[in-house]
């Protein structure tokens, strides 16, 4: 999970980043609201951890921007030294999903992060079988079927397909997809992702006439959308 952290206090940001990184999260720190907003225009994050009092853009102003420009918006944790009830209400009403009072204790931070992520991203079934309309994903075997037809796929094609279906209607940045599937590999050709997208679009028949659209998001990445209730046919999907 990728977390973006905004705090203008360098020491606090470093401490929070270390706690989250040690817990296994991919955490990126920002000390100015403008820098965070610039990143959000081109990258996907799974959670925002925002300090209320940042000089150029307050946490509340960031939340308002996210509400207007991110669809769907990532879950948001708001952190601040303010403890008055009216401040907490203001933060939650603005769109924060939860509220942390500074100084933040590591165990409370991790518990709140896990709780917000759990609510926002449901845990996949324990048997490893996931259903999306007529598409069935067997995670342990890395196999996907359309109806009763097994679709031949490479491991990376399967992982990319599952990532897109798990994030249906959510735009995913190229950087987010690259890091999720290939890690941080600067030597990977830039067309690698586009090639994989083209292949799974054909193999899974992700086209408007079959109720789905897998389309690029300009200067950002890709998004898989369900358009209608019409179902894809297995024969077309494997051509």
What residue spans do the PLM features occupy?
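Hydrophobic residue at a beta-alpha junction
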Residues: 54-57, 86
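DNA-recognition element of transcription regulators
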Residues: 105-118, 152-162, 187-207, 216-223
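Short, Lys/Arg-enriched segments at the junction into DNA-binding effector domains
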Residues: 2, 115-171, 175, 218, ...
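Acidic catalytic/metal-coordinating carboxylates
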Residues: 32, 58-61
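Active-site beta3 strand of CheY-like receiver
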Residues: 43-49, 54
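Two-component/phosphorelay signaling modules centered on CheY-like receiver
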Residues: 9-28
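Short hydrophobic/Thr-rich beta-strand motif most characteristic of the beta2 strand and flanking loop
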Residues: 6, 24-32, 39
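Basic, amphipathic DNA-recognition helix from helix-turn-helix-like DNA-binding domains
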Residues: 64-69, 73-131, 203, 239
